[in-house]
Amino acid sequence: MEFDTIAAISTPPGEGAIAIIRLSGPEAIQIADRIFYAKNSLSEAESHTIHYGHIKEDGEVIEEVMVTVMRAPRTFTREDVVEINAHGGIVSVNRVLQLLLRNGANLAEPGEFTKRAFLNGRIDLSQAEAVMDLIRAKTDRAMGVAIRQMDGNLSRLIRNLRQEILDALAQVEVNIDYPEYDDVEEMTQRMLLEKTELVRASVEQLLRTASQGKILREGLATAIIGRPNVGKSSLLNQLIQEEKAIVTDIAGTTRDIIEEYVNVRGVPLRLIDTAGIRETEDIVEKIGVERSRKALADADFILLVLNQNEELTVEDEALFEAAAGHNYVVVLNKTDLETKLDIDRVRELAGENPIVSTSLVNDEGLEALEEAIKTLFFAGDIDAGDATYVSNVRHIALLHQALEALNGVTTGIQLGMPVDIVQIDMTRAWDLLGEITGDSVQDELLDQLFNQFCLGK
C-alpha cells in the first residue's frame, strides 16, 4: 500500500529550544532535498543519518537545521521519513512547513503518521492506541502500562486467544465438511467446551484488571466535599503542593470549581475542590454549591472533609447520604484543636469507608491519607511488574462482548446443541477479539480513533 507524502509539525506550538517538522511518504526525501542546502544532497544520504544545513526560500536562508533521513522500511511508518530539527519558534517553523507543502507534501491529518504505521503493518491497533495513552499518562505506572501495550503485551495475548479459537473452529469445519474420513479427529462437545473454558478464563482474567487499568489510564474524578471552612481548599493545596486555592477563615471563599491533576502514590487523581455545600442566599455562592452537587454526583471518588473542632451537623450527615454508593475517605481535619465531633457517630455513618485524621495547618496526617487512597483502589499494591492491564474503554467493551459470546458457546454445549450451531458464537468471539488488534475493524472506526491524536503524531 502506497500513500502520498505528508508533513506536519510534531512538536507543540509555541516558543522552545527545538521544533520538529516530520515528513513521511514516497517523496519525503526528495521534497526535503528541494529546500535543504548543504554540502551533500539528502537524496544520496544513507538511512538513519543526520545532516547539517540551511532551509532556503527563493535563495534566502530562513532556518538553520539538522535533518534526519530514515529510509523505508526501518521507520515508524515503514515509509521514507525525514525529520527537520529547527529552532523552536512559531514563524520560522511554519514557514518551513508551508515551504514543504508548496513543494509537494500534503498536510497530515491528526494521527496520520501513527495510522500509516498501523496500515503498513508496523503496529496493530491496540499498539497504536497505546501511543496516545503514553502521551496522556499522568503517572509512572500509567506510562509503564502504555509502554508494555506499545511493546505488544496485549496484542500477543489477544492473538494467542484468537489462535485457540481458530484451531477449534478449523477442527469443527473439518468434521462438518469431511465426516467420512476416519483419520480426522472428531471435535466432540467436551473438547470444544474445554477449549472455550480455556479462552473464557483468560478473557475473565483480563477483565479483572479493567478497573485498575482504567484508573491508571484516565485517573479518578475526585470531589473534595464538605461544609464551608472545614479545610477543603487547604487539602487541595497540600495534595498538589501548591497554593492553588484561596484559604481564609471566611466561609464561602471558594465560589467555583477548581480542578488539578495529582499523582498520589501511583494513583492519578483529578482533584475537584468544590464550594462548601450549604444553604445560602448569596446568588454567586448558590451557583457554586449547585456545581459542587453535580461534581459530587459525577465523581469516581470522594474526600469527605469534616471539622473535628465542630459538632456534627445535619448538613454533614446529608453529605454522607450523598456520598453513599461512591468510594470515599472521611478526612477529620483540624485535629490540632479541641475535639467536639462525635467520632462514634462518624464511624457509624462511614461504615467500611476509611477515616483519616489530619491537621493540615501542621502538615499532619497527609501520608496516612495517601496510603488510605492507594490501599482503597489497589489493595496497597500497584507494582504490576510485567502484568498486562486492559485500560482502554473500547477494549473493555469488546472483551465483555467476547465473553458474552463465549458464554453462549458454553450454554449451547450444556444444552446439547450441535457443534456446528455453537460455532456461530465461537466465530463471533474470534471477530470481537480481532477488533482489539485491528485484524477485523471498520474504516469508520479507524478514522474516529486516529482523529483523537494530535497533529504530527
Curated annotation (Swiss-Prot):
K(+) binds at N229, T248, I250, T253. Binds 1 potassium ion per subunit. One of its GO terms (cellular component) is cytosol. It is found in: Cytoplasm. One of its GO terms (molecular function) is GTPase activity. Mg(2+) binds at S233, T254. (6S)-5-formyl-5,6,7,8-tetrahydrofolate binds at R22, E83, R122, K457. Coiled coil: none annotated. Homodimer. Heterotetramer of two MnmE and two MnmG subunits. Exhibits a very high intrinsic GTPase hydrolysis rate. Involved in the addition of a carboxymethylaminomethyl (cmnm) group at the wobble position (U34) of certain tRNAs, forming tRNA-cmnm(5)s(2)U34. NCBIfam families: mnmE_trmE_thdF (TIGR00450), PRK05291.1-3 (NF003661), small_GTP (TIGR00231). Belongs to the TRAFAC class TrmE-Era-EngA-EngB-Septin-like GTPase superfamily. TrmE GTPase family. This is tRNA modification GTPase MnmE. It comes from Listeria monocytogenes serovar 1/2a (strain ATCC BAA-679 / EGD-e). The gene is mnmE.
